[in-house]
Amino acid sequence: MNKHPKDAPLVGAIEAGGTKFVCAVGTCPQDLVRTEFPSGDNPAQVLAEVTNWLKEQQHQRGMLQAIGVASFGPLDLHPDSPTYGFITSTPKPGWKNTNILGAVKRAFPDIPTAFDTDVNGAALGEFCWGHGAGLRDFVYVTIGTGIGGGVMVGGRLLHGLVHSEMGHLLLPRLPGDTFAGVCPFHGACWEGLCSGPALLARAGMPAEDIPPGHEAWTREIQYIAYAVANLVCVLSPQRVIIGGSVRKAGQLGQDRFFRMIREQVRTALNDYLVSPALQEEIDSFVVPPLLGDEAGICGAIALAQLLAQQKIV
């Protein structure tokens, strides 16, 4: 994939998140014009705002060669399905059964459009320009409004039957933890226990306000470690990248947050799997995204770039 503005085609990108839509036009992470719109509960309105902005940028900068859409889900990613391009059974108010891809295609009928999950997009962004570069097998997890994950296997994104929904893994409960969880589908799944809304419900305050010694952080980190250990056992990744707003960990701090997760992952695995990556090199095994908060929109750029260049990941 071309990684420099002089080599890469001009593309549009949409990162459709549960809280906000991030839109960009450019050629690579160093060459982006971007804006944001609140997701709200009126899909028609926000999609009109998004597509109108992309049209304005196209008028100013020239014809877009492709558009990449990386969206929250669940999604229908099967091109032969009558609901291909739809957000399907999301708990987000107003967005169930929204034809997000169709809205983009109607606005840009002559421009090819790539479509995938937001977390697959972020994984692809890290694969092209971040901590997944040079790796063929890794996992990207985001912990924010919800929890989701993208998986790279053999240098290609994993899709399979539907797409990964690792945020709904069912985890062993910690002794004495009676928190019911906030997931409307599963209650105390990983997302129900560890998402931003879960931290708010458990601690009575948002993540950025929770003091470092609060029990909510102890449980949060232990459950994340359980989930990472499960991913290691099932997928055998070369690296686990954890993004999303919760990983900043407020007053606890991102460095301490990751250090504690790594310690608990080692404890959970209990030296069953033998690899330097899981022992002395674990500091480079469980890491935050190199692209930071831009992983998702950079992934949408990468989706569009690959389509424009007729490459498949």
Predicted regions and their residues:
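Short beta-strand segments
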Residues: 15, 68-72, 116, 140-146, ...
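A short, polar/charged loop-to-alpha-helix boundary motif
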Residues: 162-176
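Charge-lined substrate channels and their catalytic hotspots, especially those that engage the 3′ end
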Residues: 158
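A charged helix-plus-loop insertion that forms the helical arch/lid used to bind
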Residues: 81-97
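Adenylate-forming
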Residues: 121-128, 149-151, 170
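Short clusters of small/polar residues that mark proteolytic maturation junctions
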Residues: 36-37, 92, 162
